[in-house]
Amino acid sequence: MNIPQELKYTKDHEWVKIDGDTVTIGVTDFAQGELGDIVYVEVETLDETLDKEEVFGTVEAVKTVSDLYMPVSGEIIEFNESLEDEPEKVNEDPYGEGWMIKIKLSDTSELEDLLSADEYKEVVGS
């Protein structure tokens, strides 16, 4: 299982890449493996400001539909529109072309609540 050291993680199996006050968010390799083949990603919250732990979208796989939660508060400034036609990118490259949203961070102190790669490995038993 791939858990890049440079990223931060949540117990909801999302990864967070921090670049100044812009944060890129996606689901982890573990999550995409548990979900199975992803057939649809829906994000209807573009340009909205959401609080930490609010639902920003859903991911639909062959066997289930799961909510996607904000790991930190912020304004959703970009959605990976390529996922509309190629949702399988989440399975194939969850940390690269399978990213889901970018947000403008509202509260940098919330970053302290995210997990390191080693802490996330403990969550998934890796």
UniProtKB/Swiss-Prot annotation:
<dbReference type="InterPro" id="IPR033753">
    <property type="entry name" value="GCV_H/Fam206"/>
</dbReference>
<feature type="domain" description="Lipoyl-binding">
    <location>
        <begin position="22"/>
        <end position="104"/>
    </location>
</feature>
<dbReference type="GO" id="GO:0005829">
    <property type="term" value="C:cytosol"/>
</dbReference>
<comment type="function">
    <text>The glycine cleavage system catalyzes the degradation of glycine. The H protein shuttles the methylamine group of glycine from the P protein to the T protein.</text>
</comment>
<dbReference type="GO" id="GO:0005960">
    <property type="term" value="C:glycine cleavage complex"/>
</dbReference>
<dbReference type="InterPro" id="IPR002930">
    <property type="entry name" value="GCV_H"/>
</dbReference>
<comment type="subunit">
    <text>The glycine cleavage system is composed of four proteins: P, T, L and H.</text>
</comment>
<dbReference type="GO" id="GO:0019464">
    <property type="term" value="P:glycine decarboxylation via glycine cleavage system"/>
</dbReference>
<dbReference type="InterPro" id="IPR011053">
    <property type="entry name" value="Single_hybrid_motif"/>
</dbReference>
<dbReference type="InterPro" id="IPR017453">
    <property type="entry name" value="GCV_H_sub"/>
</dbReference>
<protein>
    <recommendedName>
        <fullName>Glycine cleavage system H protein</fullName>
    </recommendedName>
</protein>
<dbReference type="Pfam" id="PF01597">
    <property type="entry name" value="GCV_H"/>
</dbReference>
<keyword id="KW-0450">Lipoyl</keyword>
<comment type="similarity">
    <text>Belongs to the GcvH family.</text>
</comment>
<dbReference type="InterPro" id="IPR003016">
    <property type="entry name" value="2-oxoA_DH_lipoyl-BS"/>
</dbReference>
<dbReference type="InterPro" id="IPR000089">
    <property type="entry name" value="Biotin_lipoyl"/>
</dbReference>
<feature type="modified residue" description="N6-lipoyllysine">
    <location>
        <position position="63"/>
    </location>
</feature>
